[in-house]
Amino acid sequence: MTNLPKVTVRDLAESGVHFGHKISRWNAKMAPYIYGVHQENRIHIIDLRKTLPLLQVAMKALYDVAFQGGRILFVGTKFQAFDIIASEAIRCGQYYVNHRWLGGMLTNWGTVSSSIKTLMQYEKILNDEDSILTKKELGNIEKKKQKLDKALGGIREMGAIPDILFIIDTNKEHIAVKEAKKLGIPIVAILDTNSDPDGITYLIPGNDDSRKSIELYCKLATDSILAGIESSLAKSGVKIDDIRGDEFIQEKEDGIVQTKRRRSKVYKEEEREVVTNEDESR
């Protein structure tokens, strides 16, 4: 039995998910998901009764990928979303692109992998206390490192192309959508009234401009992913109560990226107290 996060139509409405774009900007393919028009502002109103079940299906898809130990890539480069995308992806131990999407990030993964290796080499050079490079040379390397880290930092540990994408605003991220479609990678995406739903595996009709709406989508996505990870661990015999507060990390072993658990500081402190108490009772 899945333990997906709970969400209601009221939750969606309170986050402004139902507000679409001006009617002049609409994509007719989104008509099935539009409730009507706000007469004063002349914007489309999204039918949240349609959004809710589609959202639940999409969250179940993310849960399933996480349960199987798959890689999930969060994509959102618009200014309303970039920081939320990064923090929520990190919270569930997954990956993200929150600045400019570089063409070929998926379809030319070999080149991207080489760039990631270069990034790591730069970091190694900069962390070498015995480096014989001049201050100017190190400064140039630092600039190159920062540029690569901004573009690739969120996927540096991914190890291979993702198993599914979670996208905010398919119009802005059209290159990511195109590459995912070409490779047959499933897409979970927020689609506003000006978006094209064709080829989107799991579409979620909703406002893709409001920070409050974006925060809700990303939180639900992350909570669904964490639920999938926890269910997978529970199936392996790990008690869920034992992993609360732990950090989930991705490690590569024998070419396979696996989700692993790093015990939290609180857990370690509690464990230390138990050992101390046992010693005192002897």
UniProtKB/Swiss-Prot annotation:
The keyword Ribosomal protein applies. Coiled coil: none annotated. Keywords: Ribonucleoprotein, Ribosomal protein. One of its GO terms (cellular component) is cytosolic small ribosomal subunit. Residues 260-282 are annotated as: Disordered. GO terms for molecular function: structural constituent of ribosome. GO terms for biological process: translation. It comes from the Bacteria. Residues 266-282 have a biased composition (Basic and acidic residues). SUPFAM superfamilies: Ribosomal protein S2. Belongs to the universal ribosomal protein uS2 family. PANTHER family: 30S RIBOSOMAL PROTEIN S2 PROKARYOTIC AND ORGANELLAR, SMALL RIBOSOMAL SUBUNIT PROTEIN US2M. This is Small ribosomal subunit protein uS2. It comes from Wolbachia pipientis wMel. The gene is rpsB.
